[in-house]
């Protein structure tokens, strides 16, 4: 039987339509300010993609690009944007110069404008099952699994970062999955992965996960984005894995489109919250 491809574009489009309706109901375009420090072409590409998607739903997404800023100058700019009642979301683009620690910077963004959802408040809210704004990639994985009907089952996540593995493990626990989380020091990842219905991989290594990690009933979610010979590929050996498993996400076209939309979903939720509570105004 042919492998089932878990595509994300349709999910992203449906979410975008819902966001557009919510913005029309608000009567005001939510505003997201992206802060980029340094000349990183990949960061600029991702920022422009968010601007483009924002326009489609009626959101005002702007990029502030700086050749060089100190940590203190960047924090000062974040404080200015935090105090601006017309700004609903703030996002610092990765990577930053080596002299600036990303997570130190994120702590200075108010939780209700933190559309990347990496602040201690938003991460902690996930841990106690009181989700507010959630990391976009982790939410994209949850969205795909829900859309295709893979819920409340066993899952192995091969990643422990604050962007994917840690929040996703807690978000899946909140939704009654039974979760194992693996990392570079985990012995015998293959056995753990094979014992789970769902396998989520995000290790930043093209072709890392091959057919020795999976069974015929495995559902594989590939979060990896790698550039190899001008092509975008994931963290799995797609040809080998797709020959064996029940279902798999393609790269590109799987998690990616939903991730971009989920940033805007956080923006709209933040704007609604600020309007309803009058916080930050």
From Swiss-Prot:
InterPro entries: Aminoacid_DH-like_N_sf, FolD_Thplmales, NAD(P)-bd_dom_sf, THF_DH/CycHdrlase, THF_DH/CycHdrlase_cat_dom, THF_DH/CycHdrlase_CS, THF_DH/CycHdrlase_NAD-bd_dom. Pfam families: THF_DHG_CYH, THF_DHG_CYH_C. Signal peptide: none annotated. Its EC number is 1.5.1.5, 3.5.4.9. Keywords: Amino-acid biosynthesis, Histidine biosynthesis, Hydrolase, Methionine biosynthesis, Multifunctional enzyme, NADP, One-carbon metabolism, Oxidoreductase, Purine biosynthesis. One of its GO terms (molecular function) is methenyltetrahydrofolate cyclohydrolase activity. NADP(+) binds at residues 159-161, 184, 225. GO terms for cellular component: cytosol. Pathway: One-carbon metabolism; tetrahydrofolate interconversion. GO terms for biological process: L-histidine biosynthetic process; methionine biosynthetic process; purine nucleotide biosynthetic process; tetrahydrofolate interconversion. PROSITE patterns: THF_DHG_CYH_2. It catalyses: (6R)-5,10-methylene-5,6,7,8-tetrahydrofolate + NADP(+) = (6R)-5,10-methenyltetrahydrofolate + NADPH; (6R)-5,10-methenyltetrahydrofolate + H2O = (6R)-10-formyltetrahydrofolate + H(+). Coiled coil: none annotated. Catalyzes the oxidation of 5,10-methylenetetrahydrofolate to 5,10-methenyltetrahydrofolate and then the hydrolysis of 5,10-methenyltetrahydrofolate to 10-formyltetrahydrofolate. Belongs to the tetrahydrofolate dehydrogenase/cyclohydrolase family. Homodimer. This is Bifunctional protein FolD.
């Amino acid at each position: 039987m042919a492998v089932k491809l878990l595509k994300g574009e349709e999910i992203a489009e449906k979410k975008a339509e819902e966001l557009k309706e919510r913005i029309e109901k608000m009567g005001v375009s939510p505003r997201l300010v992206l802060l980029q420090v340094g000349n990183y072409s990949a960061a600029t590409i991702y920022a422009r993609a968010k601007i483009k998607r924002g326009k489609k739903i009626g959101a005002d997404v702007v990029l502030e690009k700086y050749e060089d800023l100190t940590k203190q100058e960047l924090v000062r700019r974040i404080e200015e944007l935090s105090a601006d009642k017309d700004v609903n979301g703030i996002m610092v683009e990765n990577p930053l110069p080596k002299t600036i620690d990303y997570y130190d910077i994120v702590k200075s963004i108010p939780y209700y404008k933190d559309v990347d959802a990496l602040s201690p408040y938003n991460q902690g809210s996930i841990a106690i099952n009181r989700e507010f704004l959630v990391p976009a990639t982790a939410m994209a994985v949850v969205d795909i699994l829900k859309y295709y009907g893979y819920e409340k089952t066993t899952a192995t996540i091969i990643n422990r970062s604050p962007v994917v593995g840690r929040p996703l493990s807690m978000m899946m626990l909140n939704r009654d999955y039974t979760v194992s989380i693996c990392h570079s020091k985990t012995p015998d990842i293959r056995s753990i992965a094979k014992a789970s219905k769902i396998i989520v991989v995000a290790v930043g290594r093209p072709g890392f996960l091959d057919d020795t990690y999976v069974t015929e009933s495995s559902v594989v979610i590939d979060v990896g984005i790698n550039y190899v010979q001008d092509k975008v590929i994931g963290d799995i050996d797609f040809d080998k894995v797709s020959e064996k498993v029940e279902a798999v996400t393609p790269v590109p076209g799987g998690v990616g489109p939903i991730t971009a939309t989920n940033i805007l979903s956080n923006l709209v939720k933040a704007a609604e919250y600020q309007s309803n509570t009058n916080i930050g105004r």
